[in-house]
Structure formats: C-alpha cells, structure tokens
Design a protein with these regions (language model features):
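Position-driven detector of the extreme protein N-terminus
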Residues: 2-3, 178
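Mature, soluble, non-transmembrane domains
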Residues: 75-221
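Post-signal-peptide N-terminal segment of Sec-exported extracytoplasmic proteins
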Residues: 41-72, 135-138
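One face of beta-strands
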Residues: 22-26, 31-39, 96, 119-121
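Sec-dependent signal peptide recognition
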Residues: 3-10
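C-terminal motif of bacterial Sec signal peptides marking the signal peptidase cleavage site
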Residues: 16-19
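Primarily extracytoplasmic ectodomains and periplasmic/lumenal surface modules that are beta-strand-rich
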Residues: 30-35, 40-49, 101-103, 191-192
C-alpha cells in the first residue's frame, strides 16, 4: 500500500499550489496564539499529486492526507492542541496553538507577540530562512521542492520564479501558483479582525518585511 502524503510534503507545497481559496487565521489565546489554516486545492495541484500518488489497485479514490499522521507530526514540532480535518483530495483544515517559545513558528520570528497581548505574523527573508533552519531534515528537503527564493536565497524576479516552477512542474501548476492568494485574518485582543491578502508568489519571493498585525496601524497601546 502506497504511503499517503505526509505532513512534510503538505506543509512545503500545498499551501501555495492552490486556487485563491487559502486562508490563515491567528488570534491570541491562553496558550499563546491559536491558528487555523484552511486550504482548497486547485485542479492542477490535484493532478500533480494524483500522478505522484496514483490510485491503488481497483481504482478507488483515496485521500492525499492522513489526518492522524499530520496531527502526530505537528505535535512533535511543539505545536499544541492540533486538529486536522481533510476532505478527500480537495481541502484540508489544520488548527493548533503555538506557545511563546518551543516551536518553529515562534522561534523563527514568524509569530510575534506584542506586550499588549496582540499577535502578528511577520514574513521576511531572514525569518523564513530561520524557519528553514529550525525544521527537521525531511521537512527542509520537501521545502526545497518549492524552489522558493525565500528559502534558497537565490535572487530572481517573480516572473523568473514562475518560469522555473513551470519548467519543473508544468505550466498549469505554475499558473495556479501565480494566481494563488492567501488571506490572513489576524484577530486582536479587542475582538476585532484585520484581514489582508498576499499572493503566494510574493510570499515565496518575499522582499523586505511583510507584517500582518492584530492591531490597526496608528492605534495606541
């Protein structure tokens, strides 16, 4: 029986090879920060992984994901309260909690806690490189599949990056990546939500620092 896709391959690839239906929500909690990642997969992504993980004998359709395995592997990284729900080959939802230290999301500087209790997501070349360095070898190896400048350190334009993806994975996958967008919902301590979107390519080829905050710009502590 062929292995189902592991959480490592999912984390490295699936969030970005999608249609425009990915979202990330983060809010302060007693643990530190609760997060929820919701992903709907595009047809090119599904086709790519159907080729890598073909149907078993008898032609029965099976899920790309093993919910229990994903839960176990995320828990092993220091993420708490992990919950995973997949829907065959079309969608995946993962939620969990990140404490103030002891997990790659916080230790890399991607999740940042403010003195007032609000939470931010911060993406830069430096902290994505830090995240890469904190991950186990297997996960880092799958991240290499993205060929993302933010992880490889190679300087290239967004167009050059898309072209390189098309060369390796095909035009349809590259087009989905180019059209992909991630919506970020950052919930503040005052129960208000700041929502912003960023293209997948701008995230994988990040320049400078991109910050999504739980407090609106200009608000005082």
């Amino acid at each position: 029986m062929m292995k189902k896709i592991t959480v490592f391959l999912f984390l490295a690839v699936s969030l970005f090879f999608t249609s425009c239906k990915s979202s990330v929500s983060v809010k302060p909690s007693a643990v530190g920060a609760d997060f929820d990642v919701s992903i709907s997969f595009g047809s090119a992504f599904c086709g790519l992984f159907s080729a890598v993980f073909p149907s078993e004998e008898g032609g029965e359709t099976r899920s790309f994901f093993d919910d229990a395995q994903i839960t176990q592997m995320l828990t092993a990284t220091g993420i708490q309260n992990v919950r995973v729900k997949s829907n065959g080959q079309t969608s995946l939802q993962i939620s969990g909690s990140a404490a103030a230290s002891g997990n790659p999301l916080v230790d890399s500087g991607i999740i940042v806690f403010a003195p007032d209790g609000n939470v931010s997501l911060v993406f830069s070349f430096q902290n994505l490189q830090a995240l890469y360095g904190l991950l186990p070898f297997e996960l880092a190896s799958y991240i290499d599949m993205l060929m993302a400048p933010a992880f490889t350190g190679e300087e290239m334009t967004d167009g050059e990056y898309i072209d390189s993806v098309a060369t390796v994975y095909g035009k349809n996958v590259a087009d989905e990546l180019n059209d992909g967008e991630v919506k970020f919902n950052i919930h503040g301590t005052d129960a208000r939500t700041n929502s912003s979107s960023l293209s997948a390519v701008k995230l994988l080829n990040v320049i400078g620092t991109v910050r999504f905050c739980g407090k609106r710009a200009g608000e005082n502590d």
